[in-house]
UniProtKB/Swiss-Prot annotation:
Belongs to the glutaredoxin family. Monothiol subfamily. Keywords: 2Fe-2S, Iron, Iron-sulfur, Metal-binding, Mitochondrion, Redox-active center. It comes from Schizosaccharomyces pombe (strain 972 / ATCC 24843). This is Monothiol glutaredoxin-5, mitochondrial. Residues 26-131 form the Glutaredoxin domain. It is found in: Mitochondrion. GO terms for biological process: [2Fe-2S] cluster assembly; [4Fe-4S] cluster assembly. One of its GO terms (molecular function) is 2 iron, 2 sulfur cluster binding. Coiled coil: none annotated.
Length: 146
């Protein structure tokens, strides 16, 4: 046999199973990230995050004053297919994952960096995803009445 036409395949790649994202799961994820302006895939819920990174992401979005009607969250711990599927969908190995207007932004470290630089606030403002600010006068009046 001519060795020029033989291909060497390492044993590990033979036993390695590559999970392909099903068409149904891919379509569901595409719809989920495009359906709402801001979508966060996280461990737990906004009121009960189940990991420090998900907590950090929620805190950053809260500091940015994201309107609650613009944000949808998905608890990846509620469904194994969702947890693994979103990692394959984004080609990003960790949770949380933030999408803005259907585009993958990143995880909690990227969010923190964008928050610190002001870039995240600028994007959120451009897409009208920020909650209306409370007038300063009403806060002062409340304090004076107490």
């Amino acid at each position: 046999m001519n060795s020029m036409f033989r291909f060497w395949i390492p044993k590990t790649s033979i036993s390695m199973q590559l999970r392909m994202l099903s068409t149904q799961t891919r379509q569901a994820l595409e719809q989920a990230v495009k359906e709402d302006p801001i979508v966060l895939f996280m461990k737990g819920t906004p009121t009960r995050p189940m990991c420090g990174f998900s907590l950090k992401a929620i805190q950053i979005l809260s500091l940015e004053n994201v309107a609650s009607d613009k944000l949808v969250t998905y608890n990846v711990l509620s469904n194994d297919e969702l947890r693994e599927g979103i990692k394959e969908f984004s080609d990003w190995p960790t949770i949380p994952q933030l999408y803005i207007n259907g585009e993958f932004v990143g995880g909690s470290d990227i969010l923190a960096s964008m928050h610190k630089s002001g870039e995240l606030h600028k994007i959120l403002k451009e897409i009208n995803a920020l909650a209306p600010e409370q007038p300063k006068d009403s806060e002062e009046e409340t304090t004076k009445k107490d």
